[in-house]
Amino acid sequence: MQRDLPSGTVTFLFTDIEGSTKLLHELGADGYAAALAEHRRILRKAFSAHGGVEVDTQGDAFLVAFPTAPGALRAAAAAQETLARGPIRVRMGLHTGMPHLTEEGYVGQVVHEGARIAATGHGGQVLLS
């Protein structure tokens, strides 16, 4: 997989929709699909505007790498500001460290810690370590 992933000290941004199953029931399949597409558009726009590189996405969650912590924080703030106008609430976590970079992405404790930080948040929050 060929991407320009940052190396050395990296700030990870993890995102996840809060209550996605409940939201699916409330909006219905078509409404949820439209909201999810808008959520992805908003997040990807914020990531790219602030130097982020999408590492992975699963369902409604993203893992994004940034070469700088300020860029990651600006992306998270911009995304949350825009998302606040819609039905989807997203929890986000930022964690900085020195992961091991492989041909397929990142491995290391820093990645696991970042995921745990994001998982403790609530929709609309950005947690920092």
Regions found by a protein language model. Give the residues of each.
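Catalytic beta-strand-to-alpha-helix segment of the class III nucleotidyl cyclase homology domain
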Residues: R3, R44, L63-S129
